Amino acid sequence: MALETVPKDLRHLRACLLCSLVKTIDQFEYDGCDNCDAYLQMKGNREMVYDCTSSSFDGINAMMSPEDSWVSKWQRVSNFKPGVYAVSVTGRLPQGIVRELKSRGVAYKSRDTAIKT
C-alpha cells in the first residue's frame, strides 16, 4: 500500500462516493482519488472533492491485497488499489456526474448501505 493512500490524520476524513476510498480532504485535493480520478478529476479541485466525497461514512477496512481478500469482494473493492475503504458512504454523486459516468460506460452504484438502489 502506498503511503500517500493512507489517511495522514483522523480529522477531516472523507470517503469517495464512487469507490469508498478514505483520505483526508487535503489528500483528495492534492492527489485525487487513486481509483477514480480519471473520471472524477478531484486533483486540484476542492469543489469536486466536496461534490464527489462525503464526510459521513461508517466503518473502515484497510486493504493491503484487495484482489485476495474476501472482505474486498464483499465490499466491491477487489479491483481497486490498496488503501483504506469505508464500509458504507452516506450520500450520492450529483446527477450531472452520474450522467457523465454513464456516457463513459461507468456504472454508478451508491455505496450507502442504508439506501437500496
Swiss-Prot record:
Record carries keyword Endoplasmic reticulum: no
GO biological process: regulation of DNA-templated transcription; transcription elongation-coupled chromatin remodeling
Region (Interaction with SUPT5H): 1-40
Superkingdom of the organism of origin: Eukaryota
Gene Ontology, cellular component aspect: DSIF complex
Family as reported in the entry's similarity comment: Belongs to the SPT4 family.
Biological function: Component of the DRB sensitivity-inducing factor complex (DSIF complex), which regulates mRNA processing and transcription elongation by RNA polymerase II. DSIF positively regulates mRNA capping by stimulating the mRNA guanylyltransferase activity of RNGTT/CAP1A. DSIF also acts cooperatively with the negative elongation factor complex (NELF complex) to enhance transcriptional pausing at sites proximal to the promoter. Transcriptional pausing may facilitate the assembly of an elongation competent RNA polymerase II complex.
Stated name of the protein: Transcription elongation factor SPT4-B
